[in-house]
UniProtKB/Swiss-Prot annotation:
Belongs to the TrbL/VirB6 family. InterPro entries: Conjugal_tfr_TrbL/VirB6. This is Protein VirB6. It is a multi-pass membrane protein. The keyword Transmembrane applies. It is found in: Membrane. Keywords: Crown gall tumor, Membrane, Plasmid, Transmembrane, Transmembrane helix. It holds the Pfam family TrbL.
Amino acid sequence: MNFTIPAPFTAIHTIFDVAFTTGLDSMLETIQEAVSAPLIACVTLWIIVQGILVIRGEVDTRSGITRVITVTIVVALIVGQANYQDYVVSIFEKTVPIFVQQFSVTGLPLQTVPAQLDTIFAVTQAVFQKIASEIGPMNDQDILAFQGAQWVLYGTLWSAFGVYDAVGILTKVLLAIGPLILVGYIFDRTRDIAAKWIGQLITIGLLLLLLNLVATIVILTEATALTLMLGVITFAGTTAAKIIGLYELDMFFLTGDALIVALPAIAGNIGGSYWSGATQSASSLYRRFAQVERG
């Protein structure tokens, strides 16, 4: 049997990466163009009002200047496409992955995960097809057991790949809506939304670090042990023994898969994005800075 897609994981990763990159880059430009003019007008008016209040003594001079500087920096990031790309997008799409790669235990680049999964898929499929040819068409029990073992293996590979691929896609999605979210940082009532957005980006960065540490070890271990396990299965005496060996192979992959699937929850707890108290901490920190400025 010839596969329609020789390297399915690499192909799917490339297709989704190109689709989301193209679509979200276009959406980012549209968002920045839409908010640019009204935001600049509103901020200009706000700065004028802030200046009047400072002159009249209704707002502390140091506090007023600090607010104007903060708002100016945020607006520059939102309306300036080059600024947003250089200081926000490049940090989470380039700087963070390069930094995370330095902590690799195996030396296996995280970007090669789809290719590694393709190799595992191709090698196991060859053995599965060989065993399938040994099962008689009337042997329903062996057919059912064989199909179960095959689907379990598919599930473990695809779930691990899904966690890996979701990191890159969700990073692009969060960065694409960034200008809209950062507008909320200007206003006191919506500042917590921007804090949560930053928290989610930090969480994804932590998840990328955990994947680089755990997923690369798991996949490299699976690829190393796979040849030996498939050799034992292939030379088993009976077809039934080979099918049992396939389930033992599934158990091995399920163990590694459980480690990878648990990583998003671990990253979320470390990053604090799942904690209801996270935004309260951000607000409390902001109030402390405000008190220092007034003092």
